[in-house]
Amino acid sequence: MSEENMKQPEEVVLPPAGSLLLSTSPHVHQGESITTIMLKVLICLMPVVTASICIFGLNAVLVLLYCSAFCLIFEYLWNLLLKQPQTVKDLSAVLTGVILALNLPASAPWWLCLTGSFIAIIIAKQIFGGLGQNPFNPAAVARVALLIGFAGPMTTWIEPMQGFTATEIMTHPTPLGEAQMAAGTEGAATAFEQLESTDGLMQSFLGNIGGSLGETSALAILLGGIGLIVFRLIKWQIPFAIIGTTMLFTWLVHTVDPTLTPGPLFHVCSGGLMLGAFFMATDMVTSPITHRGAFIFGVMIALITCVIRIWGAYPDGVSFAIVIMNALVPLIDRLCYKRPFGWSPVSASALQMRRNEVK
């Protein structure tokens, strides 16, 4: 044998004791943190925030500041009282505050912002264990609660501003409210024709209408939504399913009875559909984990929203639909879970019987 083959193997030197860390999966890290994810979502919200300020002026600034500040305060106080590590720096409370503000009218008083922030942070988030453990979208829960408990302030609109301040209270409903009141009447066709006119749709698309801060400019929301998809922060199946199903369902209803509801473009550009589709229903914590589940989730949100808009008591039902479907996310995940290769009901039953025997 040659000298090389006769050489003894080198001694293996183990690392010092305590230098190796054992941890559970996943071991592959994308490099994203909670703070960076929240920051990216906030950046994507900037077109919507900017549009709301341009449309409603100082009133929008105050509502945004109130909700953001109150959410931060409640987050800080909860962690302080329970002696938990502070989470105010991860920007999740700020994001909740901004989305909540976009669900409120520009005329919302400070106490309404305070109540909504308490519901969003304490009731809908922290009581369930904090970020990552809340089953419902905090902003959607807060909006639903405020609509039920404080319908007056929640439906008091301000006209789009003429200067930097807007103080004129609307004496007529939003486009969705007009459509709901006209539905089924003799003048429904004329009212719907006006709402669906090029000028009417452009007003809704650009934001020159009354309503909540985040439901007036579909263009601004669309720009922010594209940013979310580019950053890969959301599953595109959810907004695609919501918008597509809404257009299909309202087209069918409008075709069957033109006096019951306006056409699909009106429904997409009006109300909180776009905001809910891109920034609320796509919440990572409260949406399904599979692509098929996300699509089903979006379809059901759209159907519930359309049913409430056409036959319900409220002009818009996006937040109601999101909260209802949040409760069904565990069921959707269970039904859409990918079975391992070779799985069958027989093998699963046999395995369960074997497990019971071992116990």
Regions found by a protein language model. Give the residues of each.
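A generic, well-ordered mixed alpha/beta core segment in the N-terminal half of proteins
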Residues: 92-166
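Loop-to-transmembrane alpha-helix initiation sites
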Residues: 135-140, 239, 264-271, 294, ...
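Structural signature of hydrophobic alpha-helical transmembrane segments
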Residues: 57-70, 107-116, 204, 208-218, ...
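Alpha-helical transmembrane segments in multi-pass membrane proteins
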Residues: 40-48, 63-75, 92-97, 101, ...
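C-terminal ends of transmembrane helices
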Residues: 73-84, 121-132, 223-232, 278-287
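Long hydrophobic alpha-helical segments that form multi-pass transmembrane helix bundles
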Residues: 133, 138-222
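A beta-strand-loop signature enriched in Asp, Gly, Thr, and Trp
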Residues: 239-241, 248-291
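N-terminal signal-anchor module of multipass membrane proteins
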Residues: 1-72, 79, 356-359
